[in-house]
UniProtKB/Swiss-Prot annotation:
UniProt pathway: Amino-acid biosynthesis; L-arginine biosynthesis; N(2)-acetyl-L-ornithine from L-glutamate: step 1/4
Protein name: Amino-acid acetyltransferase
GO molecular-function terms, A-Z: L-glutamate N-acetyltransferase activity
Subcellular location: Cytoplasm
Main subcellular localisation: cytoplasm
The species this protein was found in: Azotobacter vinelandii (strain DJ / ATCC BAA-1303)
Amino acid sequence: MRDYVNWLRHASPYINAHRDCTFVVMLPGEGIEHPNFGNIVHDLVLLHSLGVRLVLVHGSRPQIEARLAARGLTPRFHQNLRITDVPTLECVIDAVGSLRLAIEARLSMDMAASPMQGARLRVVGGNFVTARPIGVVDGIDYLHTGEVRRIDRKGIGRQLDERAIVLLSPLGYSPTGEIFNLACEDVATRAAIDLKADKLLLFGAEPGLLDGQGTLIRELRPQQVAAHLERLGADYQGELLDAAAQACRAGVPRSHMVSYAEDGALLTELFTRDGGGTLVTQEQFEKLREATIEDVGGLLELIRPLEEQGILVRRSREVLEREIGQFSIVERDGLIIACAALYPIADSDAGELACLAVNPDYRHGGRGDELLERIEARARALGLKTLFVLTTRTAHWFRERGFQPSGVERLPAARASLYNYQRQSKVFEKAL
């Protein structure tokens, strides 16, 4: 119970932040076939109940493949896009129609079996996507395979205003009445861009983007994507990553890659600080900056446990407010996770590095080194020649970074007179 209460408390800022936001969610056909599909639907209904404006885009690739196989037809692709002749288009229409009904039925069933019962959740679809043929590429005619020409932004917006979930299928219609087979990733990306969505959420088989060693990459800038696309080649994660980057370049603040196979992956990504997938964003999710008076409360939360352990000298709120200009901080999505302060020492060309602290959950990301570099740069800018640090627990860390053992007698008089002999802090210094 305590874990649940703590989770809810930590999630509450995100619940408030996501209310009335527009999220475009892309779920491929593989995700619909997966045993976790029911949990994903439940989580989508939960998001809707929390005031999120939802547009759900579904895929249909494995379902199309099954219908082609049943009819003895061979799938044809070029550059990872299906070539859609008339028999294939018939399979596409059959698969998409069946999936729409299945998704609507599951959303309705989940509503009746959850606290949302009686909330009149509505799922709305329609001819919201106008398409055009891809045409001939490299001498290959794509026939009834198309690309998104336009999203009916106003029509979708009206349905979202009426608190409906909008369901978009990977089909588009031309002004002349033709039907085109579309890539669900393209539909989702264009919908997110044209609707000016707050988020694009892309489901895949993996937890997110993995590096060459299989480690999850938690955050990327769009300009970092090209190297990963080259490594991934035709892998489906590459398609998702490309879609995420395109959306961000076109103004969508954040795109997320999450797993359809992991129960709760969507909620973990949206309602925890570090998420569980890969975030692609132009925004600086974590930033190193100088502290302001508004940061005093967050600083107190960070340093208080270390003060209680005797690692840091205790500072009152009044002292922090008075000395806030000395602090540099690392802020991660609104939370202060690290800090350090520089105090120039009167009547000398030396300064003191003090109150270097990093949240225990973030102590292996090099943030202490970043803060040390920032403090040293600030000291040099002030014309200081020597940086002192007094510590009781972290002597080895500072020695590994160029600080040499020193003594109280080496401190400038203004600082030596304040030395606390009860703490018996060790003194180190570093020439700048």
